[in-house]
Amino acid sequence: MGKKHTWKRTTAAVMMLGLMTSAAGCSQSAAGKAEETVKQAIEAGKVESTEKDSVIVTMPVTSEPEAGFDPAYGWGAGEHTHEPLIQSTLTTTTTDLKIGKDLATDYSVSEDGLKWTITIRDDVEFTDGKPLTAEDVAFTYNHCRDNSTVSDFTMLKEAVAVNETTVEFHMNHPYSIWPYTMAVVGIVPKHAYDENYGQHPIGSGRYVLKQWDKGQQVIFEANPDYYEEMPEMKKVTVLFMEEDAALAAAMAGVVDVAHTAASYSEQQIDGYGLTAVQTVDNRGFNLPVGEVREKDGITYGNVFTADINVRRAINIGIDREEIIENVLNGYGTPAYSVCDKMPWYHEACEVEYDPGEAVRLLEEAGWREGKDGIRKKQGVRAGFTLMFSSGDSVRQALAEETANQLQEIGIEVKTEGVGWDVAYDRAQSEPLLWGWGAHTPMELYNIYHTAENGNGIGEARYSPYVNETADAYMDEALAASSLEEAYELWKKAQWDGSTGITQDGDIPWIWLCNIEHLYFVRDGLMIGEQKIHPHGHGWSLINNVDLWSWK
């Protein structure tokens, strides 16, 4: 290690106020909050990073797990999936999002896809010294099936411990991507699990929860009895704060990694560099398919976006690179699907920006330019309202940039911030800017497949759309005998040469960009090779924190 990061915390705290209030882009209120958060930690003797084997990281306040560190209630296997750190999982995902093994030494699935058999290691102990067995695995999954509030376990009928090292998963229906579920569900001890587990978790993973000061920080320490190679980082402190406060903390030199946003990307911080991590954290909007109809007080369909030529024109009439430059300061990649770069992604989703062809498609469909530059057809103006979640400045900027671009080809787009209490219903007839991106192909299913319980009209859940051929491919993918076979079927659901969800298919959704996750990282800290991050700017960063090192 060339230089040891042994700065004085108390001196940094004294310097912080001046640094924060002078920092461009940092509001005084945010600066004050950052100062108070870090000063409290310093005074309590909790924030220290003076050794080669410790690190301090900031995360958004929304990353703090409300229900604690319990896999049944969102830890690891929640909306924003990540490795649970405290607990072990049966499988894991590699940097290219293929499946590896953690507790599992072998796994297989029956020919009918209704039984998974997993063999686990026999040398793993929980941090209370008790052995981890198949009983614990079965208990964990059955408990998640019955109680999980954030993850779908409806495919699981029952988990059964056959012996101490063998567990069987009996399924309600074939589910070939079960290994991806096994990669995020942390195993909890049957003997030590109760309603308070999330506050005081016992696991067998790489780290132990040492301290949790709610609303402020969590501290992890390396598990001394971990069954694989000991973590390089023996202590990991996570501070929860907003982006402007995290920036201020980095400027004061009291954190090693600070999450940030594109709006702060031009900040120069002495002793830190800006790191951009590739993601599948995408933004896109739905285009309701089908004519307007109503059911149970909800309007479905849209007279303008029902036209397939309109949807195709919109897809190629948007300059994604310009959006990324204007809204994200260049920190993003064009998105063409909900699963770019994933093993199940079909490259047929990609399109070139072609406003000339977009205009031709609109003209061909009878949408003629009016005196005000907006197209019309049989008295209907070419346009729609593009909604975004209120308070999300990035989605608002994306919506406004999209509106500006589409106006160039004669489409009038109005933007509106809405709350999620009305957004879901309104999205059945109006486009809404969404954020998606997961380490599982099930997201394709959830967005495009006809909803099992219907969405009121027997079509896809989030926006009216039906493609029976694509549905069949996705059903076949879930019933496939191997992940490799399933990957090809997921690709066919996107485009099989004749139909699908791509530009030459039905194009019921438009994808704009994948937002790169940005961090100010202290010089000398090596954060290793990062997996492609899913939706959510939080725990994914420290999936591999055990491999981080100082030089």
Predicted regions: what they are:
Residues T58-V109, I202:
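N-terminal lobe/hinge region of extracytoplasmic solute-binding protein
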Residues G74, T94-K98, P174, Y180-P231, ...:
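Gly/Pro-rich hinge or "lid" segments in bacterial periplasmic/extracellular proteins
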Residues T133-T140, E164-E168, G205-R206, K234-K235, ...:
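Alpha-helical secondary-structure segments
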Residues S151, E158-V160, K210-E221, T237-D296, ...:
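Extracellular/periplasmic solute-recognition and catalytic clefts
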Residues D213, Q217, N315-H346, E350, ...:
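Detector for C-terminal structural segments
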